[in-house]
Amino acid sequence: MDYPLNNQPATDRYDRMQYKYCGKSGLQLPLISLGLWHNFGSVDNFSVATDMIKYAFDHGITHFDLANNYGPVPGSAETNFGRILKENFQGYRDEMIISSKAGHDMWAGPYGGNSSRKNLMASIDQSLRRTGLEYFDIFYSHRYDGVTPVEETIQTLIDIVKQGKALYIGISKYPPLQARIAYEMMAKAGVPCLISQYRYSMFDRAVEAESLPLAAEH
């Protein structure tokens, strides 16, 4: 760790990272973001998790990506991140892009793991409480569940922005047909889709066929 002795982020942190505009928005994101899917749950070492967040921010990584079911235990990554934020980054919230998602299994019963309005509204309120935040910079529908009408899910995301619980919205792992419906519905409502999150690497380039060109159109 090359954190200063006064435990404050390095003053040259923004010189250590490049940033690009996200889609057609005015929001810049770092070329590298930190996902909290692993290493930040209640079964992990909290001190190590804290050091990772500090090191990332110290090197210009401003985007921290959560989901309500990240852990393990589900929800614990958001809780731990909220604690890290409170204990180490007072005064730096406006320099961070914090995102979360909902749509995978989170609690028992028929309302705890789909993309319905019921689930998404409950989920974002729970996530805000766990993190101690007043809003998320980005909130995603974590998946198309194959049952909930896309229109219901997307209208809920639009309403979440209008309620001030998120600044931007996005989708994750949506098939092309449902993604097109989402993009067009968001644009018509004046709340365009900021970002689409897919599995994409040198070893998995399937999204190049349809999903990436479709996203580029919008």
Residue ranges and their predicted role:
Residues 1-96, 162:
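N-terminal binding-site loop/beta-alpha segment at the start of enzyme catalytic domains
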Residues 2-16, 144-218:
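Beta/alpha (TIM)-barrel catalytic core signal, keyed to glycine-rich beta->alpha loops juxtaposed to Asp/Glu
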Residues 21, 29-33, 62-63, 95-99, ...:
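Structural preference for beta-strand elements that scaffold enzyme active sites
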Residues 35-47, 106-121, 142-148:
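Active-site mouth loops of central-metabolism enzymes
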Residues 37-39, 67-69, 101-105, 141-144, ...:
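Active-site beta-loop-alpha junctions enriched in small/polar residues
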Residues 43-57, 114-131, 152-155, 179-183:
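Short, acidic/polar
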Residues 91-115:
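Structural motif corresponding to the early beta-alpha repeats
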Residues 128-149:
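Active-site groove signature of glycoside hydrolases
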